[in-house]
C-alpha cells in the first residue's frame, strides 16, 4: 500500500492541518515509510508468543469493585446554576 499526493492532502484536510504544496512530497514519503514499517510488522511470525502488556513483567494489583455514591453529590452540584436532584440542568440545545 502506498499513499499518493491526493491522499496526503485529504488526510491533512480531515486532520485540519495546513499543508503547503511543497510539504506534500515530504509527507508522502514519511507516510509511505510508516506504512512500510507496519507491513514489515505484519510479516513477523508471532505464533506461540504470549501477548504482553508491558516489556517488564508486572502484576496489576487487583481490588474488589465497590459501588458507592462518593458522599459528595451535594457538594458537586452546589455551584451549578440549575439542578434537579443530583443532576445538572442545562439549556435545551436540540429541538
Curated annotation (Swiss-Prot):
Question: What processes in GO biological process is this protein linked to?
Answer: glutaminyl-tRNAGln biosynthesis via transamidation; regulation of translational fidelity; translation
Enumerate the SUPFAM superfamilies for this protein: Glu-tRNAGln amidotransferase C subunit (SSF141000)
Q: Which Pfam families match?
A: GatC
The superkingdom listed in its UniProt entry is Bacteria
E.C. no:
6.3.5.-
**Which molecular function GO terms apply here?**
asparaginyl-tRNA synthase (glutamine-hydrolyzing) activity; ATP binding; glutaminyl-tRNA synthase (glutamine-hydrolyzing) activity
Keywords attached to this entry: ATP-binding, Ligase, Nucleotide-binding, Protein biosynthesis
Q: Which cysteines are joined by disulfide bonds?
A: none
Give me the reactions it catalyses: L-glutamyl-tRNA(Gln) + L-glutamine + ATP + H2O = L-glutaminyl-tRNA(Gln) + L-glutamate + ADP + phosphate + H(+); L-aspartyl-tRNA(Asn) + L-glutamine + ATP + H2O = L-asparaginyl-tRNA(Asn) + L-glutamate + ADP + phosphate + 2 H(+)
> What's the family?
Belongs to the GatC family.
So what does this one do?
Allows the formation of correctly charged Asn-tRNA(Asn) or Gln-tRNA(Gln) through the transamidation of misacylated Asp-tRNA(Asn) or Glu-tRNA(Gln) in organisms which lack either or both of asparaginyl-tRNA or glutaminyl-tRNA synthetases. The reaction takes place in the presence of glutamine and ATP through an activated phospho-Asp-tRNA(Asn) or phospho-Glu-tRNA(Gln).
How is this protein organized at the quaternary level? Heterotrimer of A, B and C subunits.
Q: Could you identify this protein by its name?
A: Aspartyl/glutamyl-tRNA(Asn/Gln) amidotransferase subunit C
Originating species: Bradyrhizobium diazoefficiens (strain JCM 10833 / BCRC 13528 / IAM 13628 / NBRC 14792 / USDA 110)
Amino acid at each position: 500500500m502506498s499513499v499518493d499526493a491526493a491522499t496526503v492532502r485529504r488526510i491533512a484536510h480531515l486532520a485540519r492541518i495546513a499543508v503547503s504544496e511543497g510539504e506534500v512530497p515530504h509527507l508522502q514519503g514519511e507516510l509511505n515509510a510508516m506504512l512500510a514499517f507496519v507491513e514489515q510488522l505484519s510479516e513477523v511470525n508471532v505464533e506461540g508468543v504470549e501477548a504482553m502488556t508491558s516489556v517488564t513483567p508486572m502484576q496489576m494489583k487487583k481490588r474488589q469493585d465497590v459501588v458507592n455514591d462518593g458522599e459528595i453529590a451535594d457538594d458537586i452540584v452546589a455551584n451549578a446554576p440549575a439542578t434537579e436532584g443530583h443532576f445538572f440542568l442545562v439549556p435545551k440545545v436540540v429541538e
